[in-house]
Amino acid sequence: MEPQNTTQVSMFVLLGFSQTQELQKFLFLLFLLVYVTTIVGNLLIMVTVTFDCRLHTPMYFLLRNLALIDLCYSTVTSPKMLVDFLHETKTISYQGCMAQIFFFHLLGGGTVFFLSVMAYDRYIAISQPLRYVTIMNTQLCVGLVVAAWVGGFVHSIVQLALILPLPFCGPNILDNFYCDVPQVLRLACTDTSLLEFLMISNSGLLVIIWFLLLLISYTVILVMLRSHSGKARRKAASTCTTHIIVVSMIFIPCIYIYTWPFTPFLMDKAVSISYTVMTPMLNPMIYTLRNQDMKAAMRRLGKCLVICRE
């Protein structure tokens, strides 16, 4: 039998959200506002923590790095999505699609590991407050940050290593606004049952286990707060509550997408928007609105900028 000739697709067509021109313009303006807010909010956190010496603590060091990840994470999908709103045909090259998958999972995986590091930071702060600065020293903080990035890199490489050998000979239509593993895998011209199982294990099952472990960790921390004084307990409880909100905002949509990733649902795009576009914008708002120290530091930074201009 002669081998069947297959042509590898050179690009994918993204269906996006709507084919109506008026709605496309409205969505462009809406998501442009969201993206600009995301950039400004996360940059504000990074600048404030960098220039305010009162925030040079392990918790804010980690928060600054999380803001950097959020900024980069939104940049993986949002600029391409905004450009596509202005074009009738939305395409992405095969290489661009693979690059988007790599950086999407690098930063997404890094976020998951970062949230774990921040949970550990809060545990040390509550359980051993007198030794907190000694334990969470600069060397350990930098090591934990590097470990989070390495964890995200390993997770991303695994995703890419499973997809790159696959043949894509058509169709090439992705029912989404960006490239991700579940949608791309459906287009492969071969049986992907084993890969689907591996992807669910690497993403879906891992996300569920990690989410439960983080919830248990914060429950333990909140229980430990009972032994603290009123003011310190309220401040620590507020910080932990903020972390739980952020963890839930990130993990719940991911569980929805990656636990049943190869069966398309009507809500897939809306859920994808929630954690690829909305969460990076909401994170800095949540951390600043519930954090008196951060708000005070931003006011000091604003006053300094006004004085410098005068």
From Swiss-Prot:
Gene3D superfamilies linked to this entry: Rhodopsin 7-helix transmembrane proteins (1.20.1070.10)
Subcellular location: Cell membrane
Membrane-spanning intervals of the chain: 26-49, 58-79, 101-120, 140-158, 196-219, 236-258, 270-289
A Gene Ontology cellular-component term: plasma membrane
Domain of life, per lineage: Eukaryota
One GO process term, biological-process aspect: sensory perception of smell
Keywords: Cell membrane, Disulfide bond, G-protein coupled receptor, Glycoprotein, Membrane, Olfaction, Receptor, Sensory transduction, Transducer, Transmembrane, Transmembrane helix
Record-linked SUPFAM superfamilies: Family A G protein-coupled receptor-like
Disulfide pairings: 97-189
Pfam families, sorted: 7tm_4
Segments in the Extracellular topological domain: 1-25, 80-100, 159-195, 259-269
Regions of this protein lying in the Cytoplasmic compartment: 50-57, 121-139, 220-235, 290-310
Glycosylation sites: 5
Bilayer disposition of the protein: Multi-pass membrane protein
Function of the molecule: Odorant receptor.
Protein name (database record): Olfactory receptor 4D1
UniProt organism field: Homo sapiens
